[in-house]
Each structure stands twice: as C-alpha cells, then as structure tokens.
Amino acid sequence: AGVRVRLEREFRRKRLGPMQYEHITRHLDPANPNVLTIGFARRFATYKRAALILRDRERLLRIISDADRPVVFLFAGKAHPADRPGQEVLREIKRTMLTSEFAGRVVFLEDYDIQLARWLVSGVDVWLNNPIAPLEASGT
C-alpha cells in the first residue's frame, strides 16, 4: 500500500493523469499473493548492473506476460550526482517503465528514502542482485 501511495504522490507532483497512474500501478496489488514482486533498490552504480534484466527485452516480455505467473519489477534508488553512467541506468529504467509493453510490470519509485527501503525489503519476494564480481561483496 505504501508503494502505491508513493507513486500517487509522484504522479500528482508531475501532474500526470489518473489513467497514467492506473496504467503504471495496475499490477501492484498487495492483496494478490500470486504476483511475484522482484525488487532492486539503493545506489545505482554500473557495477551493480540493476538494468541487466532489461537487456534481453524479448525474454523480459515473456517473463512479465505470463498471465498464470504475474511478475512485477520494482526499482528504487539514486545514482551519485557525479556518476553519469549510473544516472543513465536510472533513465533507462524510467524509459522502460513508460513503454506500453512494460508499463505496470517495470516500475521505478522516486525519492528513495529509509521508509521506502523498509517497504521494499519487507514486501518484495525476490531481491535482484547482479553485481560484477569482485566489485560488490554483499549486494548492498
């Protein structure tokens, strides 16, 4: 529920319409235990490879399009202001979120903070962790 509230606030701030909000959030139903929620959050450094799942678009589309096994990817976090490649990873995820085939299945949550981190850590089913070894020791 907290994630939907956060998205609603973001959409109001950006003056986006209710249809866009519904399109993006239509699969975020905390009451539906059948939706597999996969999350990635924290710092968007390139060695963490948050967007690796987006590289094979056809495969990702097959994963998220299975009506019997619905999947939603939630991304949240920030890139260091001087990390231009990390900022580009964020932009790639945001662009993907807005495309018709991935809207509502790939979601980026802005304004990452400790409360959002708590919601994600306690609410996602699988934590996405694809770092380049040995640059990341623990997946933080």
Regions found by a protein language model. Give the residues of each.
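Catalytic cores of carbohydrate-active enzymes across secretory and cytosolic contexts
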Residues: 1-140
